[in-house]
Structure formats: C-alpha cells, structure tokens
Amino acid sequence: MFEMQRIFHTGIVVDDIEKAKAEIGASLNLTWTPVRVFDSLVLWTPERGLFEIRNKADYSRQGPHHLEICEGPKGSVYDPAILPHGRHIGVWVDDLRQETDELLENGWRLLAANGTPDDDYGVITYMAPPTAAFVVELVATKLKPMIDTWLLEGC
C-alpha cells in the first residue's frame, strides 16, 4: 500500500486554467511553473478503452507539497462536471501496477490510467474508493525527473 508521506501534490480540475491560476495564486501567494500542454495525452478507461485527449497542467512552485491545476476536455477525468469536487492527491509509487491492483482488490475503482492493464497502466492511474468522492492519482516514480525539471522551469 502506498505511503502517505509520498504525497507530493494536491490537484484540482478546472474549466479555465489561466483564470484559476490568477484567482488562486493571488489569494494564496503562489507562483506557477509554465503551463504544459499535452496535445496527445494517452488515457485508458474500462469503459472507453485507449484514447487520446488534450490536457493542460500546472504546478505551484511552492512545495514540497505542490498545488496542481488541470484543465481537460468535457467527459474526461479532468472535467469538473464529472468530478464536481475536482480534487485529488498525487502520490509517488515505485510499482504502479502493484499499487493499482492492491486498490482494485480493496474495492477501489479505476477511473483512468495512462496505459492499458497489459501495459501495467502506463505511468499514472486515477483511483476512487468505493464510498467517497475522493481521487488518488498514483504516479510512477519514473516520472519524478520530468516533474522535478518542470518545477524548476523559468526560475
């Protein structure tokens, strides 16, 4: 089971990333990394199979626990209308497949993954417990160098 000490961000999903950055940044005294646009982010869901979406994401520079803001298309895991609370925690995991499978065995639902089960779910999975409006993003540690570089961009 993942360790709470490995949480590295709290994420929210929004309709307008620039508006959210301005509102939240000014109110909470946060500065931001450059927004990254993922034009072909691969997702897999049990319902739709494998598909691609366009997604934008940004992190607060302040940490070590960062705020992540995501904007994505309607009908996806990044749609605030589907996940009205729009909140998740991001946790580093060494073995994404094992951690995802353990949560599934405990009754959690797989909302989306970055790859198919045959591909060990890629590098991220979004998981929800059976009875709560809460999402955990399991993030493979092999993404850590990319995230660390992103957090330093523009400094």
Model-based region annotation:
Residues I7-D15, D58-H65, D79-L96:
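Vicinal oxygen chelate
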Residues R36-P46, K74-Y78, P84-G86:
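A cross-kingdom feature marking solvent-exposed beta-strand/loop segments within repeated
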Residues V77, T131-V136:
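Short, charged/polar, Gly/Pro-enriched secondary-structure boundary elements
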Residues V135, V139-C155:
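Acidic/histidine-enriched, glycine/proline-rich intrinsically disordered or flexible terminal extensions
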Residues P64-G72:
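Ordered, amphipathic secondary-structure segments that act as subunit-interaction surfaces
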Residues F2, V13-Q62, Q98-Y121, P130, ...:
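Core segments of cupin and vicinal oxygen chelate
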